[in-house]
């Protein structure tokens, strides 16, 4: 009952947001003509970004091919999201969970400016026809702990992972990220840090998936 109640509130508060950013992540509009341009490359992975109309912020995207079966990659992405595998994490509280949804409260460290916190809903969806799994991370309001002392609440997070078949029975992993930091930080000051964080996230996840042991892969074949 607690899980159902919390997730219902999440659905209502997410849909009630007045100014939804015009993103292309996870949509058919995510094509070359959407305005993506290369921003930076690290360890062979290129981060693209595109300006989001009506905001001063960018949406980020990165794609990497991995020699890991998609089913194994999807399971490990879920474990990473559930476990909070991120360098900036100070505190995580899983408020509710089911096999395909998580409701999470996080506090994260942000250099120079005040630390941030947020509540996000993570949903896992499998498309059998295309053999792809989507993990969408969406900020929600009105549930979870209040803003912690010394923190600023991040008002908008839209991010996630797309796991689908790649070459030679491997995985094509796509990462999307968009956020607005809240507080008094201007878009001009935030953009570089957001891009750096997005690139670090995809590089870290790619390394994690490449380290899956033969035993891990065999159990998921």
Write out the residue ranges for each language-model feature.
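Bacterial N-terminal signal peptides
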Residues: 4-15
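Eukaryotic helix-grip
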Residues: 19-221
């Amino acid at each position: 009952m607690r899980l159902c109640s919390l997730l219902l509130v999440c659905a209502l508060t997410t849909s009630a947001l007045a100014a939804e950013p015009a993103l292309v992540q996870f949509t058919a509009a995510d094509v070359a003509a959407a305005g993506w341009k290369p921003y930076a490359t690290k360890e062979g992975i290129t981060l693209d970004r595109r300006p989001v109309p009506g905001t001063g912020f960018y949406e980020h995207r990165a794609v990497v091919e991995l020699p890991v079966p998609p089913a194994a990659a999807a399971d490990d992405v879920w474990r990473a999201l559930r476990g909070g595998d991120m360098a900036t994490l100070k505190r995580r509280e899983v408020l509710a969970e089911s096999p395909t949804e998580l409701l999470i409260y996080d506090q994260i460290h942000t250099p120079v400016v005040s630390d941030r916190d947020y509540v996000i809903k993570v949903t896992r969806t499998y498309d059998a026809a295309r053999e792809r799994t989507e993990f969408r991370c969406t900020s929600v309001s009105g549930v979870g702990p209040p803003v912690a002392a010394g923190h600023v609440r991040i008002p908008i997070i839209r991010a996630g992972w797309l796991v689908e078949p790649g070459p030679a029975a491997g995985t094509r992993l796509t990462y999307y990220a968009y956020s607005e930091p809240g507080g008094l930080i201007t878009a001009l000051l935030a953009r570089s840090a957001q891009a750096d964080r997005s690139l670090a996230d995809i590089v870290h996840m790619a390394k994690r998936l490449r380290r899956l042991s033969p035993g891990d892969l065999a159990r998921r074949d």
